From Swiss-Prot:
Domain Death, residue spans: 767-855
Residues in LRR repeats: 143-166, 167-189, 190-213, 214-236, 238-259, 260-282, 284-305, 306-328, 329-351, 353-374, 375-397, 398-420, 422-443, 445-466, 468-489, 490-513, 515-535, 536-558, 560-581, 582-604, 606-627, 630-653, 654-676, 678-699, 700-722, 724-745, 856-863
Region of interest (Disordered), ranges: 1-37, 51-100
Keyword Thylakoid belongs to the record: no
Protein's UniProt name: Leucine-rich repeat and death domain-containing protein 1
GO cellular component labels: cytoplasm
Claim: Repeat is one of the keywords in the record: yes
Keywords carried by this UniProt record: Leucine-rich repeat, Repeat
Bias kind Low complexity: ranges: 88-100
Length: 863
């Protein structure tokens, strides 16, 4: 095989591996790619009718291993890479497919580089292992050469010795285990390794023996606790890729300069402050990640890496660029977001191959007209700077596809912006734009347009010429009339015009049959327009914060509607017309004036989420209990009439996962709440609840419990049964057991441990009280006490009464009473209080004095 072919194969592995690391690192992919991909995927999901409802998992999903041959694994990776070059699969709608095809083709050129920042599961291929060991490790063998072993998240605490003794193992993935050292790994067993990945293991160092791995091409020890790289790493002459992302490295490992074949180096998210001048010895380095370190200057050494194509310096403290940056002749991607740049050195505009330049969140006030040199530029991110204008010369960047200028001080765009014929994404949110220029209409390939947070009063009718546009956001401007030009956009599926002054909807919107997502909240709408009802493909409609009072019967035509938001309107009665929406999943009628719910709501067979918070219900609307599909219910009343009780029928909603009954005047939780087996979240704060029913403690999937601001004085000891609980809050309760300071940390273990010890203590105190009563009670008071404790004579009479002392009989009677009371789930503390009340009623004051003394003594002892 030629050297060129070998390099190509290694670079292919490089791309695949860098994907794996970068996804686990949560490295952001370029905004244009990510957002546009999400946008198109969302459209695809809409068209395919996919649900986006949240899925709750109480227990982590089990990870299984698959086995294929090495060549099969490589074929699989190649196939997946090809898939990743596409933004989405062909849509079921011809129109959408046509509008997206050009987008896909244009971006394919640099999508391979972007794919460095997206993770793929590495092919899991198993080595030759005995059938017994295969069964034990969950491995299978399908070939006899070039094996990959993937033991990710298997709970391993040391290297799997049996696997290492197999000479054919070449690729070993041990990510997400607890392997903290190389102890137990015989370096001789590792000699054949070409890829070793130990991400997320808690490693604090690398052993010097790593120098023996002469065949190693890829080493990934990202997401560990490594602070030092041993000098022996310089002996890895064949290494192509090194990943040390998210560790504690403070000094750049100078020994890396000996790794002449290194192509990818990731040292992002460490504590580096300096880069050595010897770095240029890495003459084959193509990708360098130094994001989120502590670099205060742009290291000049970086400028002399002749083959560098991607450089990430995001999240440092760099305030200027050196003139030597012009030497990076092959650089295609430069990421400098979140730094301290106040200007750009003019030499940066000599990087003629640059395709992606990200400069968001700096302090740039001006962009040089020399930007015209960037003839290959595809992506330009300039959000969150101090720019007041963009030079006209930007229109010489003929290949530009993504331009984002949000959060600056722009008042207008370049007059000849229409020359950017390839522009697909233009975002100018939160600036000082007064109008959208007519020249926008000549951007024939534009797909995503955002001008939210400006002072725009109208949209030019010529926008109708942008027939490939699929998403528009115009939120929080000064628009008074619905832009008619938008109604002529055949590919528009997402439109958001929240926070404007629109009071009427034109009939022309009826022609926007392709529209899937429409937001018009915080406008001046007085009615639910009949024209909305012609949008038969619409899935999401937000008309919240308007002044709508009723719903037209023709809403039944909106057969695709999944989400309907009508919060903060003027509804006084529940609109029965909504009950014809058989496909509705989410309905928000919060902050209206509803007093009751129609029984027709049972027709919403697919409803999953309801928000009726802050209304005027006289009673809990029991009609809701018919909804078998409901997963989330919010009936909190921070602004509405307070509910005082919950019906037992609440338990009929067996699919319920989230319940919010906060800010009411509810006195008790239904005793059968334990029948809501799927409940994950219960918010009942700011009520008058004084007791937690035992059945609540059987909710095994419960993860969130908020009972703050109630009247709880004690927590049940069995609260530890809620083993899935992750978030708890008992603040602002008059708690005595446990005391409030124990609950402030919101740690279930601390609370449960206290209650366990308190139970043990209360049991001992109760037994001592039994002895005090038995040793001091009179025959007459004993009979009265039995009556007060509801103990029948048959339970206290003994066959040998003449020979059994009063003390023994009294103690036996109290034990019987305790046994009976335990059936009612009464705690030892509650039994003690009940017994004291009974003794007070029969006038056993001498005994009471002794018990009081005992209580005072025990309270003085801290436990």
């Amino acid at each position: 095989m030629s050297e060129k072919e070998g390099m190509s194969e290694e670079l292919e592995d490089t791309i695949s591996q860098f994907r794996k690391e970068s996804r686990s690192q949560s490295v952001k992919e370029p905004g244009f790619i990510k957002e546009t991909s999400n946008l198109i995927n969302e459209a695809s999901d809409y068209l395919e009718g996919k649900s986006s409802n949240q899925i709750y998992e109480t227990h982590p999903r089990q990870i299984t291993l698959e086995s294929t041959s090495s060549s099969g694994s490589k074929s699989k990776r190649n196939e997946e890479q090809k898939k990743n070059l596409q933004f989405s699969e062909t849509s079921t709608r011809t129109e959408t497919s046509q509008s997206l095809s050009s987008l896909t083709g244009r971006i394919a050129e640099y999508q391979a580089l972007v794919n460095f920042l997206s993770h793929e599961t590495v092919g899991e291929v198993s080595p030759q292992v005995s059938e017994e060991n295969q069964k034990h490790l969950g491995l299978e063998t399908t070939c006899k050469d070039n094996f990959t072993v993937n033991l990710e998240a298997k709970g391993l605490q040391e290297f799997p010795k049996d696997i290492l003794k197999i000479k054919y193992v070449k690729h070993l993935y041990l990510d997400k285990n607890q392997i903290k050292t190389f102890q137990g790994a015989d370096s001789g067993d590792l000699l054949g390794l070409e890829i070793l990945s130990l991400q997320e293991n808690g490693l604090s160092s690398l052993p010097s023996e790593i120098q023996l791995l002469h065949n190693l091409r890829i080493l990934n020890v990202s997401h560990n606790h490594i602070s030092h790289i041993p000098k022996e790493i310089s002996q890895l002459g064949n290494i192509r890729q090194l990943f040390f992302y998210n560790n504690y490295i403070e000094n750049f490992p100078s020994d890396l300069e000996c790794l002449g074949n290194l192509e990818i180096l990731s040292l992002g998210k460490n504590k580096l402050r300096h880069i050595p001048d010897t770095l240029p010895s890495l003459k084959y380095l193509r990708v360098l990640n130094l994001e989120y370190n502590q670099l205060t200057i742009f290291p000049k050494a970086l400028c002399f890496l002749p083959k560098l194509i991607s450089l990430d310096l995001t999240g440092n403290l760099i305030s200027s660029l050196p003139k030597e940056i012009r030497e990076l002749k092959n650089l295609e991607t430069l990421l400098l977001d979140h730094n301290k740049l106040t200007f750009l050195a003019v030499e940066i505009f000599q990087l003629l191959k640059i395709k992606e330049l990200q400069l968001a969140d700096n302090k740039l006030e001006v962009i040089s007209h020399k930007i015209e040199n960037f003839r290959e530029l595809r992506i330009l991110i300039l959000d969150k700077n101090l720019l007041k204008n963009i030079p006209e010369k930007i229109c010489c960047c003929a290949m530009l596809e993504c331009l984002t200028l949000s959060d600056n001080k722009l008042t207008e765009l370049p007059k000849n912006i229409h020359k950017l014929n390839n522009l697909r994404k233009l975002h100018v949110n939160r600036n000082n734009m007064v109008k959208i220029t007519d020249s926008i209409s000549h951007l024939n390939n534009i797909c995503s347009l955002e001008f939210s947070g400006n002072i725009i009063a109208g949209i030019p009718i010529e926008i109708k010429n942008c027939q490939k546009i699929i998403k528009i956001e115009l939120n929080y401007n000064k628009i008074m009339y619905f832009p008619l030009g938008l109604c002529a956009l055949d590919s528009l599926y997402y439109l958001s015009v929240n926070g404007n002054y629109i009071s009427e909807i034109p009939a022309d919107i009826s022609f926007s049959k392709q529209l899937l997502h429409l937001e018009l909240s915080e406008n001046k709408l007085l009615i639910f327009s009949e024209h909305f009802c012609s949008l038969i493909n619409l899935k999401y409609l937000d008309l919240g914060k308007n002044q709508i009072k009723k719903i037209p019967a023709s809403i039944s035509n909106m057969i695709s509607l999944h989400v309907l938001i009508l919060c903060c309107n003027k509804f006084e009665t529940f609109p029965r017309e909504l009950c014809t929406l058989e496909n509705l999943r989410v309905l928000d009628l919060s902050e209206n004036q509803l007093q009751k719910i129609s029984s027709d709501i049972c027709n919403l067979k697919r409803i999953q989420k309801l928000n009726f918070s802050s209304n005027q219900f006289i009673h809990f609307p029991i009609e809701l209990c018919q909804l078998q599909s409901l997963e989330q219910l919010n009936i909190s009343q921070i602004k509405g009439r307070k509910l005082t009780r919950l019906p037992g029928e609440l338990s009929n909603m067996t699919q319920l996962k989230e319940l919010d009954i906060s800010n009411n005047a509810i006195r008790e939780i239904p005793r059968n709440i334990g029948e809501l087996r799927n409940l994950v979240s219960l918010h009942a704060y700011n009520n008058q609840i004084s007791y937690i029913p035992p059945s609540l403690l059987s909710l095994n999937d419960l993860q969130q419990l908020n009972l703050s601001g109630n009247n709880l004085t004690a927590l049940p000891s069995a609260i530890y049964n809620l083993f899935s609980l992750k978030e708890i809050n008992f603040d602002d309760n008059p708690l005595l057991r446990p005391p409030m300071e124990i609950c402030k940390g919101k740690q279930l273990y601390t609370i449960a441990r206290y209650l366990q010890r308190a139970d043990e203590r209360d049991e001992k105190i109760l037994e001592k009280i039994f002895k005090i009563v038995a040793n001091n009670i009179t025959e007459t008071n004993f009979e009265f006490l039995c009556q007060k404790l509801n103990l029948a004579n048959s339970e206290t009479d003994m066959p040998t009464k003449s020979t059994v002392s009063l003390s023994e009989r009294a103690h036996q009677a109290l034990v019987i009473w305790k046994t009976q009371s335990n059936k009612l789930s009464l705690t030892a503390a509650a039994l003690r209080d009940q017994l004291i009340r009974a003794l007070t009623m029969i006038g056993a004051y001498e005994i009471m004095d002794k018990i009081t003394a005992l209580n005072l003594f025990t309270r003085a002892i801290k436990f």
